[in-house]
Amino acid sequence: MRKIIHIDMDCYFAAVEMRDFPQYRGKPLAVGGSSDRRGVISTCNYEARAFGVRSAMASAYALKLCPNLILVPGRMEVYKAVSQQIREIFSRYTSLIEPLSLDEAYLDVSDCSLYQGSATRIAEAIRSDIFKETGLTASAGVSPIKFVAKVASDLNKPNGQYVVSPDTLMHFVRALSLGKIPGVGKVTEEKLNALGLKTCADVQQVPQTLLTEHFGKFGAVLYERAHGRDERAIVSHRERKSVGVETTLPKDLHTREACLDVLSSLIPELNRRLGRSASGRRIHKLVVKLKFDDFRQTTIESRAEEPSVRLFESLLSQAFVRAEGRGIRLVGIAAGLVCRSEAEQEGSAQLALSL
């Protein structure tokens, strides 16, 4: 069986800030946007979490929960540089590394001969190296399969690790709450519970067709996970499937025209990102996202052989109808990408949106 490690840095952005600015240590701290500019929390330390502050929470609400919260803007270039340090540490142990974000990654150490091939000891060594060289702590999950390693990395936080051996894998999976499986959000979990399914053991007692009937393709994935199966390989180089840009607004917008003005302001940045990261691919769809003042959101998309600003405007107009009187707090646009054929690559490689 494979030996998979999932490394997850502990409250990463906040930890970097506490490392670089010791005066923040021991105090509730969050990294995010300003509360007077409709900001959102990116991450927070454990002192802030004790007050109920969480990632993706509105900064203004976080300050209500924790009036003494220290709120600092993010320093993305610093976080990226430290993340690169961490990935260099990973590369000492394996070349099979799948970064999921700046602060987490999967590693396949099946062929690593260090520490007599013990994945447990390799995970300990990686975490030790990270702390010695960056001053930051990491947690780890070790398992023969990817999703269990990810779940396990959260069980002994912060600065710990949890091992699910091949012998204990099925026992661990059977007892696992379905809400712990990556991809199962609150709404999906509620639907599963309504079907009488709360744990993987429950899913093991029903036919796959029940899940696919209610959840489509994801139902088949869920069935596999609940039976302790996850054959996904480590993906070292992941092609981006979309490029997007969005902005949280200082004040809610209540007219379509105001939203269209914001959309127009996002186009130059989207073009810049497309030019930087979409080489060898072409646009095949455009997407507009709106988030409302109750934090619910909607997206609408359309196939686009000849993408244009006018199509974005049409999509936004359709999405705006769904506001039903609610204010708009965020506007986002994105372009879905697919690989070009050789013939297409010999022709124009222009990805900029036409006006």
From Swiss-Prot:
It is an enzyme of class 2 (transferase). Poorly processive, error-prone DNA polymerase involved in untargeted mutagenesis. Copies undamaged DNA at stalled replication forks, which arise in vivo from mismatched or misaligned primer ends. These misaligned primers can be extended by PolIV. Exhibits no 3'-5' exonuclease (proofreading) activity. May be involved in translesional synthesis, in conjunction with the beta clamp from PolIII. This is DNA polymerase IV. The keyword tRNA-binding does not apply. Binds 2 magnesium ions per subunit. One of its GO terms (cellular component) is cytosol. Its main location: cytoplasm. PANTHER family: DNA POLYMERASE KAPPA, DNA REPAIR POLYMERASE UMUC / TRANSFERASE FAMILY MEMBER. Keywords: Cytoplasm, DNA damage, DNA repair, DNA replication, DNA-binding, DNA-directed DNA polymerase, Magnesium, Metal-binding, Mutator protein, Nucleotidyltransferase, Transferase. The gene is dinB. Residues 4-185 form the UmuC domain. One of its GO terms (molecular function) is magnesium ion binding. Its EC number is 2.7.7.7. HAMAP family: DNApol_IV. It catalyses: DNA(n) + a 2'-deoxyribonucleoside 5'-triphosphate = DNA(n+1) + diphosphate. The record marks F13 as: Substrate discrimination. Belongs to the DNA polymerase type-Y family. It comes from Shewanella amazonensis (strain ATCC BAA-1098 / SB2B). InterPro entries: DNA/RNA_pol_sf, DNA_pol_Y-fam_lit_finger_sf, DNA_pol_Y-fam_little_finger, DNA_polymerase-Y, DNApol_IV, IMS_HHH_1, Rev_trsase/Diguanyl_cyclase, UmuC. The active site is at E104. GO terms for biological process: DNA-templated DNA replication; error-prone translesion synthesis; SOS response. Monomer. It is found in: Cytoplasm. Mg(2+) binds at D8, D103.
